[in-house]
């Protein structure tokens, strides 16, 4: 039974590696579309952080004597595709920034769940080095999620409600006018 759990850990770590690589590519595209400086800065910081997180996952794979192979995290693929599709639906501006935050937070929440599971499995198997590396990344993912919420509340939301961009903003202001 322990061997099955160890194999599960290997598959989960490979999945996490794929997820981080996909998230990194998504962020690299999103940072170019963001218009709020605090959001751009936050995404850029998390891009750099994600590169380190990928290195940590590589360290874990090395300690487990496995390679990532061709494993693709299908859940992350779906989250990234959805985020990219939604980003393409909006013009640059505060509403697009909200869309970027929404997509990034869905990705962060997936990563938080994945790292939590990975930590539990690694801990049960006595893989303390992996537990330490995974825990460090989990904390960073939680902090990124909080920062995204903070940037939204402090900078993006008011601008989106005031003007927004494109058709989405016009529909929102028409709805507010009718409600008045």
Q: Could you say what each language-model-derived stretch is?
A:
Residues 1-180:
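Amphipathic alpha-helical hairpins
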């Amino acid at each position: 039974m322990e061997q099955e759990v160890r194999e599960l850990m290997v598959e989960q770590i490979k999945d996490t590696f794929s997820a981080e690589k996909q998230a990194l590519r998504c962020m690299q595209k999103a940072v170019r579309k963001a218009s709020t400086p605090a959001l751009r800065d936050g995404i850029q910081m998390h891009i750099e952080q994600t590169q380190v997180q990928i290195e940590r996952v590589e360290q874990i794979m090395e300690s487990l004597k496995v390679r990532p192979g061709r494993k693709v995290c299908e859940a992350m693929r779906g989250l990234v595709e959805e985020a990219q599709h939604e980003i393409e639906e909006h013009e640059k501006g505060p509403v697009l920034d909200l869309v970027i935050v929404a997509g990034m937070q869905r990705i962060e929440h997936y990563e938080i769940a994945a790292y939590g599971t990975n930590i539990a499995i690694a801990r049960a198997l006595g893989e303390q080095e992996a537990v330490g590396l995974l825990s460090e990344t989990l904390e960073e993912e939680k902090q990124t999620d909080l920062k995204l919420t903070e940037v939204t509340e402090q900078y993006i939301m008011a601008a989106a409600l005031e003007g927004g961009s494109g058709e989405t903003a016009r529909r929102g202001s028409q709805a507010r006018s009718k409600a008045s």
